[in-house]
């Protein structure tokens, strides 16, 4: 799928901050490299399940981000649908920043294995705040 120009921007901030309600994600970019920031929900993908954002760093590594309340199953479905429609490159990361506590257990471990095996994607889940560095 081609991402419309109106849905993306290029940023070179040291910290690219994404926030919705109580969940926030910081993409650390200390060398101020160009990062393509895509608003997925409501722009790049209009209908069906979709994550909130996609960041593509200067090495073409994709970072799919879902800022979520408590519904982790829905967050996983949103990331899967977005990767299927927009994913092009590997390595790839998928992030869920949730207000749910705790983010442990067999369901979480199984989801991480599923993403690695089926999507060649490293799934990272955090509570309320997540920070990730440019590769």
Regions found by a protein language model. Give the residues of each.
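Acidic-basic catalytic patches of nuclease active cores, encompassing PD-(D/E)XK
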Residues: 1-46, 56
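Catalytic centers of nucleases
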Residues: 46-56, 72-75
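Generic beta-strand structural signal
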Residues: 63, 92-93, 121
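Domain-level recognition of nuclease-like catalytic cores that cleave nucleotide substrates
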Residues: 1-8, 43, 99-135
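Nucleic-acid nuclease catalytic cores
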Residues: 72, 86-110
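Histidine-anchored nucleotide/phosphate-binding helix
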Residues: 76-87
């Amino acid at each position: 799928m081609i991402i419309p120009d109106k849905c993306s921007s290029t940023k070179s901030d040291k910290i690219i901050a994404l926030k919705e309600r109580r969940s926030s994600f910081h993409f650390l970019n200390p060398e101020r490299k160009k990062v393509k920031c895509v608003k997925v929900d409501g722009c790049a993908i209009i209908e069906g399940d979709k994550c909130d954002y996609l960041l593509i760093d200067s090495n073409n590594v994709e970072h799919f981000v879902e800022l979520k309340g408590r519904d982790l199953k829905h967050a996983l479905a949103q990331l899967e649908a977005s990767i299927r429609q927009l994913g092009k490159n590997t390595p790839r990361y998928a992030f869920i920043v949730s207000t749910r506590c705790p983010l442990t257990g067999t369901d979480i471990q199984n989801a991480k294995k599923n993403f690695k095996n089926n999507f060649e994607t490293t799934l990272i889940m955090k509570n309320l705040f997540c920070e990730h560095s440019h590769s």
